[in-house]
Amino acid sequence: MENQLIFVRVATLNDIKYASEICRETESSAIARGTGIAKRPVEAVAQKMRDGKAVIAVTAAGIWVGFAYLQAWEQGKYVSNSGLIVSPAFRNSGVAKAIKDRIFKMSRRMYPDAKIFSITSGAAIMKMNTQLGFEPVTYHDITQDESFWEGCKGCVNYDVLSGKKKCNCLCTAMLFDPAKIAQQLLSPARSPYFPMFLSEAN
């Protein structure tokens, strides 16, 4: 849909009315694309809104556009950015990136020292993650909290994950490590192609 004003903001109690639609679209999108997206209970989505840990996009007319949420694990050591979904009518409009950027900034603000991760099989999300500073990692590099992996049981590919003892699956794990980013910023920049050398005055 073109020429509609879209608001991307933190979800509130008033947005719980969209929870059922979000869950339905998440499930139907997984079926249509044949990808592994875990089913999410309506109440779980509603609770994220109550907790102020979700981002929603809606039009000025109140039409739901998109959604994503965050969750802390291991006492805030890790934070997942999950559940990114956009209504089919608004895809390819840039709203997914706007939601992704907002949930990432929320995560950094609420948990500044946490490692932020995302697991996805979608190329578009991988690209957005890379632009934000995420890097591909092994599953051992993200949270080992069993509660997180329990959430994968609603995915059609859970048997693959279980069979590989949660070492890998069809999704790619990507991680943003603030400590690593800070270290890179402190390190002197060096060209990967040319050695360092000093020039002498003639």
Per-range role (PLM):
Residues 86, 92-107, 116:
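Conserved acetyl-CoA-binding loop-helix of GNAT-fold acetyltransferases
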Residues 24-27, 32-88:
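A conserved beta-strand-loop-helix scaffold within acyl/acetyltransferase catalytic domains
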Residues 1-3, 108-113, 117-202:
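Terminal substrate-recognition subdomain of acyl/acetyltransferases
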Residues 1-42, 56-59, 183, 188, ...:
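Short amphipathic alpha-helix that is part of the acyltransferase structural core
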